[in-house]
Amino acid sequence: MKVLILVLLGVVILQAAPIRKVENLLPTRNPPQNELVYWCTYANQCDFCWECIHGICRNRIQADWPVIHQNDWIINCTVSRWNGQCHYYEGSQQYLHHEMDCINPTSHTYPHTEYMKIYERDDL
């Protein structure tokens, strides 16, 4: 009986303990390279997710995204992580703040993708 109680107590403790500790990340405009997939899924309009050459931009992470013209849809962002909460701040003048549980990410794509200026071959 005591063994059963100890086993059950151990299971409860293991379930209550966090499985993975995520390190804090101070506010940055350049998240670590190994975290770009995460941040660019969460905040895909951030400038660190795009590579722009001569006004034509490609998404660095998501190859299936369209090639777009460099425009206001791509914005400056600052990202951070503290105590399991992930944050990103969009814009350089007036910040919009988004927050989520890092383990359960939610995309906050704003402005919506219909504001992207998709590059067409006829645009040359």
UniProtKB/Swiss-Prot annotation:
InterPro entries tied to this protein: ASFV_fam_110
Identify the species of origin: African swine fever virus (isolate Warthog/Namibia/Wart80/1980) (ASFV)
Which keywords has UniProt assigned to this entry?
A: Glycoprotein, Signal
Q: What is this protein called?
A: Protein MGF 110-8L
Q: Say what the protein does.
A: Plays a role in virus cell tropism, and may be required for efficient virus replication in macrophages.
The UniProt entry's sequence similarity note says: Belongs to the asfivirus MGF 110 family.
Q: Which Pfam families match?
A: v110 (PF01639)
Position of the signal peptide: 1-16
Q: Which residues are glycosylated?
A: 76
